[in-house]
């Protein structure tokens, strides 16, 4: 009888505690993720001799884990004084074209990012800037095909404008994932087995792309053909086509397409 009474009293106390009102400041509220209005292009000016660049890569990984690699599209632009173009024995990832972009944007240190072609951003501020750009609405949609075998690459890029009086440029880049090459780490030590992702390889249609103009043409949908001969040393299975449309207001839309 005594045990039964203790059980009843315990249950009553539990019910009372469960019914205790939680203060307004103590309640957990669900915060929905920001709605995505467009994809975002993040150009990471990086280098194999840049000790802080692995930290920037971690920031990219975090953003892509949160939003997806098809939404936050990264390009590792190996360039500048900390870039490395290689020797006969050591693989380098920097390019002359990468240096051209580096100088154009006036990059002063690495790692530095350029988000949606809107200017330089320190990697510690990438998350906030990317989040804001994701909220922007766009009037441009892009789709692409990638065809060919071996070193042959060809296809079409379709750009649809849902607004009149649209002007911009279409830029096509190639990037490669999963390249094992030397990288200086934050402690200054060289890591010969570092895996580099989204490494810029080349621009398919010129340094600054090609003009696209739609004047009073609601729903105009140009189809742009392209053709390119791949470097034999690149791994086709790890290559991506990056296609984006930009104007003076920045990148209007960007996509990536696996080869």
Label the predicted regions.
Residues 17, 46-47, 56, 113, ...:
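Small-side-chain structural scaffolding
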Residues 5, 28, 65, 192, ...:
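Intrinsically disordered, low-complexity segments enriched in small/polar residues
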Residues 27-29, 60-65, 101, 127-132:
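Intrinsically disordered, low-complexity boundary segments flanking structured domains
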Residues 19-23, 54-57, 186-190:
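Short N-terminal helix-initiation segments at or just after the protein's N-terminus
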Residues 1-41, 51:
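Bacterial Sec-dependent N-terminal signal peptides
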Residues 70, 76-259:
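Short, conserved sequence motifs used for protein processing/export or organelle targeting and
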Residues 31-80:
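Local sequence-structure signature of Cys/Sec-based thiol-disulfide redox active-site neighborhoods
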